[in-house]
Structure formats: structure tokens, C-alpha cells
Amino acid sequence: LARVAQTQTLKLGYREDAQPFSFKGADGKPAGYSVSLCQKVAASLQSQLQLSKLDVQWVPVTAGSRMQAVTDGSVDVECGSTTRTLGREQQVDFSNTIWVEGASFVTLASASMNRVADLNGKRVGVIAGTTTDSALKSLSARGVVPVFVPIQTHTEGIAAVRTGKVDAYATDRLILVGEVLGRPSDVALKLSEDYLSIEPYALMMRRDADLRLAVNRALAQTYRSGEIIEVFRQSFPAGARPSALVEATYVLNALSE
């Protein structure tokens, strides 16, 4: 936080392919739910630090590079779709929860795959090192053993399903919704109703208690004021409503000063 104050610069990491949380919009600029929250955070930090100006620099990261980008200082805060885990907290800090999601999988609409058990023996694309990767590997305890196919990006994963390279692609459910709805194709896909895991999303940042507190103060204000509802409406399709878990997240993290 001291570096941000001294340089009057905030480096925010974003994903180019994690719709609807963090992606490159049609105008080439960062967009999405997490990006909007980080814009709220940036405005709050400028006020908290009493800066006349704050230069916000957006830095693209991937699922594979985001942790390193945070730990080596390339970005101060990562505004993506990152799941908070105790293992990751050994290396980085996290904000309070901003979303609660679950991992699922997508297949061709014509495929006879609907339940988690149907993944047994099937080629399943997944980004290595993610929480979805861990969830899939844990299925062996239930007698479900997929054939893992390494994928680099969500866009690549969806394309692999459509071209038949994999039988299914697994990642966080809402990202799959964004990818399927946001990228029309002649090849119809379907999303499983089963969940592989429950994923609490948070903003990832360098190990800095002062920065974490400042970010959480910004988020709490956004929740308390009701501004989070407008962020939600701008980020998701018309008529969409937060799940009960997400609504609880807003209430529980609307902390008072």
C-alpha cells in the first residue's frame, strides 16, 4: 500500500477470457464483474490515501501466470475469477469473498453426458493447477476417473469441446455460462446441472495487511451502500439474480467501520 501511495499508481491484473468476471471487452478494455469491483476499489484507495490522482494500470494475466504476477509485484491486485484457498494463502493475500461459484462441465448437446459419473473414462479438458483440476482428481475416490487433457484458456477449452478434441471441458460454472452464451456457434453445447465443487472467489493481492484492509474497506462500502446491486446488473444478463449464497456473501461482508 505504501508503494501505491508513493508512486500514485495501482497495477490491476485482469483476465482476457474469464467472462463474465474478467475479460477483454469489444472495445479492447477490461470488463466484467470483478473488473467493476476493482474500479470501485481503485476509487476508494485514492480517497483513503488522499491522493490527488491515482494512475490505474491494467495488466493482462492468465490462469497460469496470475499467482506469479502477484507475488513478483507485476500486479498489486488481481481482478479475476480466483478461488480463495488455504494453500494459496501461503503465498498471497485475499480480499473478503466477492462471489460464490461452483465448478461444472460443458459437453456437446448431442452427448449422453449429464452427471459427474458420466465423466468416467471420458476426455476432460481442464486448466492444470486450478481448483477445478483438484476437484476432478478427487473424483477417483468415487470411482470416477476421467482422462485429463491439459487446456491453457477457457476459450481453448470450449473450442476443444466443439471440435471433438475433448468430451467435456470443466471450470467454474458461471464462466462456462459466459463462454457458451457469449460465443455463438453452429455447434450446440449443454451445461451439466451437477457441481464438482464450491468455489469462493476473492481478489488476490500481495502479502500486505494494510493493502488487504484497504481493499476490504472498499468492498464493505460497496456492499453496505447497495452499489453492489448495480455492479451485478451491469455484469450479468437482464433478469439474472444473485444466488442465495452470493446474497449471503454481500450481507456478511458489509462490515461496519
Named regions from a protein language model:
Residues L1-E78:
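Extracytoplasmic small-molecule ligand-binding "clamshell" domains
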Residues Y14-A18, V59-G64, G73-T85, A109, ...:
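Beta->alpha turn/N-cap motifs
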Residues E16, W99-S110, T155, R173-L174, ...:
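Periplasmic-binding protein-like
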Residues D27, Q39-D55, T132-P150, V180-S185:
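Ligand-binding cleft/hinge of the Venus flytrap
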Residues G32-S44, S110, A117, G121-R123, ...:
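Extended ligand-binding regions for polar small-molecule ligands
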Residues L51-Q68, A111-S112, F148-A159, E199:
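Short helix-initiation/N-cap motifs at beta->coil->alpha
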Residues G64-S65, C79-Q91, A135-S140, A160-S197, ...:
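A ligand-binding cleft/hinge motif common to bilobed small-molecule-binding domains
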Residues R66-S81, R88-G102:
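Short beta-strand-centered segments that line the small-molecule binding cleft or hinge
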